[in-house]
Amino acid sequence: MKIGILNADTVELPGASEFGQYPEMFARIFWAIDPAIQFEKYEVQFDQYPKEINDCDAYLITGSKASAYSEESWVNKLKEFIQILHQNKTKLIGICFGHQIIAEALGGTVKNSSKGWHVGVDSISLFKQEFNFNDQDSEFNLIFSHQDEVIKLPENAKLIAGSAICPNGMFVIDDHILCTQGHIELHKDFAKLIYDFRKKQIGDAKYANACKTLTDETDELAVVKILLEFVKK
């Protein structure tokens, strides 16, 4: 299987070079489950796209500092590509910004959250049991780092997970699109660098709590397994 990573950002954080760029982070976490997966990187932030849609079996849109409702030309071009992938029922995964821009591109709405920043390790509840993540319960923990949120899902989307602070935390569209607001790719030390960099924006209390939660266990490998099962169906 080949997954095309539609990279929407560049890592420029001080002290973060050891973690690489987002495509490398995603490759590492997917290879932890299936070392045979191939990856192709497309810098959509610089208008780089596959020549043909079927160049890859599935695509994944990364996180980004940009807003899904931005009028930047590359953001609008990415929305157009999402619509093409949807029309062709090409497998597509969205993570954080990817989750948001897929919702925006297909008729949903993304806005700055009235609840402010959502940061740290947090739990999200699974609503649709056909997407069980483990045999024990219907909650899982992921790293979060976002201020925008999906406030309205696309008309044909099915909500499968959420929480009080992130109601539209995960959704599917038919059998070819799966999106999650939580991160699967971020190392906890890298997340700490993000929170350090954004401390003033986040606020002292939320920053302190977010850093404290980074000692909690996370379920990114369980989520990666579900994503792979989804794209391989």
Task: Give, region by region, the residue ranges found by the protein language model.
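N-terminal beta1-alpha1 cap of cysteine-dependent amidohydrolase-like domains
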Residues: 1-73, 77-80, 84-88, 208-233
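Amide-donor transfer/coupling interface in amidating biosynthetic enzymes
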Residues: 2-8, 12, 87, 126-233
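Short glycine-/acidic-enriched loop or helix-start segments at secondary-structure transitions
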Residues: 15-16, 51, 70-71, 103-105, ...
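Short, glycine/charged-enriched secondary-structure capping and boundary segments
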Residues: 18-21, 54-56, 73-76, 107-110, ...
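Conserved beta-strand segments of alpha/beta enzyme cores
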Residues: 38-40, 109, 141, 158
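Conserved beta-strand termini and adjacent loop/short-helix elements that scaffold enzyme active sites
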Residues: 42-44, 113, 145, 162
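A short acidic, often aromatic-flanked loop/helix-cap motif at beta-alpha or helix-coil junctions
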Residues: 46-50, 118-119, 151, 167-168
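Cysteine-nucleophile active-site neighborhood
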Residues: 62-130
